């Protein structure tokens, strides 16, 4: 290769490096900073743009769970929201809207690939990454939320905010996104609530695992519920909103026991590993994925998949 060829390679390398650096820098400058920052009142309709990372995860065009936009290509949700990972072509996400149904401000993106931890069983390792088939365009109503900064010790505030279109106290599913401030409860304190005899039986298996924590108001009966699963527990830390929890499960929404959340910090290394090893065309641009989609679609037409676990 001559000097001209080496020069071209060097320019390509520098361009790729600069693009990667700029993208990372830009993400950190916009994540967790909603344009609309008005006063939040709990247990009511959310304002448009207040939670711009909120996702409506749809299976076969119907809302099934919540989720959180964490970059221009990735969404984080709960693993139990995913019926079958090879059904990725039937999943889409709805962004930029507070309406459960379609609206003029929202935009739909299709899922090209799904990643779930190998150790996921029922409520354990209840976390999933969804790669979108096209890049998300950020706006005043579509922005990512920051992930926890594992390079330094973060102090989780006494209360955070849960959002979603889940079932309310009347048993109805609201059409408008709901927001609720909930107190954060440590894993140990929550374990005593869910497993009161555990203190007398130290060998008894824990209910609240090391990758879980709780949040919710026991007395006021305010909590996340069915339909909120996979949605964010957003905490305001160091001037930005960070995704500290994913709505996972609970028993009888808002009745004496708090909701249980997957601890995002616990899975931060897993998240980084999945995203870093996914090349630009991972999933959506794959010929194998396209041909598989047609086959899977015909299989899906002839088989009714089971409902996902939806305790939260």
UniProtKB/Swiss-Prot annotation:
Gene encoding the protein: Prss48
BP GO terms, sorted: proteolysis
Pfam families named in the record: Trypsin
Cysteine disulfide links: 65-81, 160-235, 190-214, 225-253
Active site: 80 (charge relay system), 126 (charge relay system), 229 (charge relay system)
Family assignment from sequence similarity: Belongs to the peptidase S1 family.
Source species of the chain: Mus musculus (Mouse)
Name under which the protein is recorded: Serine protease 48
InterPro entries referenced in this protein's UniProt entry, alphabetically: Peptidase_S1_PA, Peptidase_S1_PA_chymotrypsin, Peptidase_S1A, Trypsin_dom, TRYPSIN_HIS, TRYPSIN_SER
GO terms for MF: serine-type endopeptidase activity
GO CC annotations on file: extracellular region
Taxonomic superkingdom: Eukaryota
Subcellular location: Secreted
Keywords of this entry: Disulfide bond, Glycoprotein, Hydrolase, Protease, Secreted, Serine protease, Signal
SUPFAM superfamilies documented for this protein: Trypsin-like serine proteases
Signal sequence range: 1-22
Span of domain Peptidase S1: 40-276
């Amino acid at each position: 290769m001559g000097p001209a060829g080496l020069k071209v390679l060097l320019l390509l390398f520098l361009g790729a490096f600069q693009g990667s650096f700029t993208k990372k820098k830009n993400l950190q400058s916009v994540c967790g900073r909603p344009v609309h920052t008005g006063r939040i009142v709990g247990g009511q309709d959310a304002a448009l743009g207040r939670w711009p990372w909120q996702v409506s995860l749809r299976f076969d065009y119907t809302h099934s769970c919540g989720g959180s936009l964490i970059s221009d290509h990735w969404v984080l949700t709960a693993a139990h929201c995913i019926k079958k990972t090879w059904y990725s072509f039937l999943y889409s996400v709805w962004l930029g809207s507070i309406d459960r149904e379609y609206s003029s401000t929202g935009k739909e993106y299709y899922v090209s690939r799904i990643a779930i931890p190998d150790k996921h069983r029922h409520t354990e390792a209840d976390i999933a990454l969804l790669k979108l088939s096209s890049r998300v365009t950020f706006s005043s109503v579509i922005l990512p939320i920051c992930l926890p900064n594992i390079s330094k010790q973060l102090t989780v505030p006494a209360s955070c905010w849960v959002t979603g279109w889940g079932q309310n106290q009347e048993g109805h599913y609201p059409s408008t996104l709901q927001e609720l401030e909930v107190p954060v409860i440590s894993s140990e304190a929550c374990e005593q609530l869910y497993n009161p005899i555990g203190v007398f039986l130290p060998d008894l298996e824990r209910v609240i695992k090391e990758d879980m924590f709780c949040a919710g108001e026991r007395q006021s009966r305010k909590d996340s519920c069915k339909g909120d699963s996979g949605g964010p527990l957003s905490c305001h830390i160091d001037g930005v909103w960070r995704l500290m929890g994913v709505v996972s499960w609970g028993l009888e929404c808002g009745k004496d026991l708090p909701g249980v959340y997957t601890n995002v910090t616990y899975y931060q290394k897993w998240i980084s590993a999945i995203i870093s090893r996914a090349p630009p065309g991972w999933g959506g641009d794959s010929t194998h994925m396209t041909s598989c989609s047609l086959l899977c679609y015909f299989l899906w037409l002839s088989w009714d998949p089971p409902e996902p676990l939806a305790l939260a």
